């Protein structure tokens, strides 16, 4: 019985060497055939011709899986890729960083969000390559890397079939539109391949293996924190089996990336997870643990860690939530199919494996089709948006926020973000954190008016498209008619409402001239403190008309001399260009931005990346 445990790099065969099912390998030059005195040695095999070598490579599982994945992702691009669902969010982020590549804060959604809180890498890569092109590339490469791992692990007796199961799983990921997660998984599978497919002749160069695996693990987490969580499961399984070098190589970098990004670009929110969502990933983690051979210790431990982690995710609210199901959707089928040759045909275990594998693929296939149907945007979003945009521009909607009742496709999050600041967007964690009334059954005419005032909403758009689950009550409330909403325009696709007596985005003595995704321009009529209803971040800065960050308040020379004589003496600052404070307001504890304006004039707020973020006021001026 071959060992089904994935080999350590020191056990793994060299890529150019043949590997038997026991995981041992011998070079062609050292392999000999025992002979009897009466039997002469066999003649040496004829060298492989280029045609034979090409034929062998074309039939290799990695080649077949990669080619199949490439073809299927091209078909996805032409026939199934749309502009709704997760694709809408990724389109919005890619367009934002394309228009504002140096901005650390996107003001088009939820008052303000850091691009890094979504992904460090994917918005910029998608902006360059295109969202759908990125999906085709990462799905194809991930399928090829998965096939490589399956070929190199001696325990896998049916690598081609398992590789094709992986191709189907990555195709379903594309059908659901998860480009950012797919990008992270490409790097994650690459990191795992570096650990498990390390060449035999380099088996003692563990530092080199770590130098390859760790950056890939960091890129995986920087692309998608959920992909980093997958690496955490693999690292935990390796660590528990005392395979520490591999565990450290792929497990430490994700922790560092998550910690650093959370410190520099804080974000909080909760991704919901229902009991129905919990059931299937836990079920398949149990099936993998029970049905694979008992000596597949690493696989079984990973399944157990994943199952426990899924239960904890359900019990403890977090930003992961239902996203944790994606790991089972990608790899449970591969593990179950790899275990099939170890079961006696037509035994109970064999039938259980077949049924589990079929059930897994039915689940991910049905979920993908459901995602396509549910998130397909109405044609009006692509063909008849211009009249709505024209009306928003005519009424000056760019001076406040606009609430577009979220459609099931969430197409509004990308279609209108370039033109106005949206009160909402497409990030479930942020929506539940900042707008809980849409989820906790507290929405009524009074609370809705309070919410409109809280976020300085000046206009409300009601699409005729089917609303999102978190917007059904809102759409019904608006349709009923509210005294503080006045319909000012409509056609067969949209209704536009003006909010009567809206709360301004910036309090007097300031007026907002323009509020866009990349910044806000306000005119201050007299010096003083101005409350601006933008969630505070350390990256917000004041810039001049050329976009250059203005000088921060400077300590006076007299104050510096006083501090030399007495460290406890109060400091004095000259605030020449203005500075920004964080202030709390309202019953929700909102942390808004306050401008300390030293003189009348025009002030511009943006959030450029810089070593000393923002234009904060010193404590003495706060």
Regions found by a protein language model. Give the residues of each.
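Start-transfer (signal-anchor) and selected internal transmembrane alpha helices
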Residues: 1-13, 19, 28-75, 621-622
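Membrane-interface junctions at the ends of membrane-embedded or membrane-associated helices
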Residues: 109, 196-209, 240-248, 336-352
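Specific aromatic-rich, kink-prone transmembrane helix
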Residues: 145, 167-171, 183-203, 209, ...
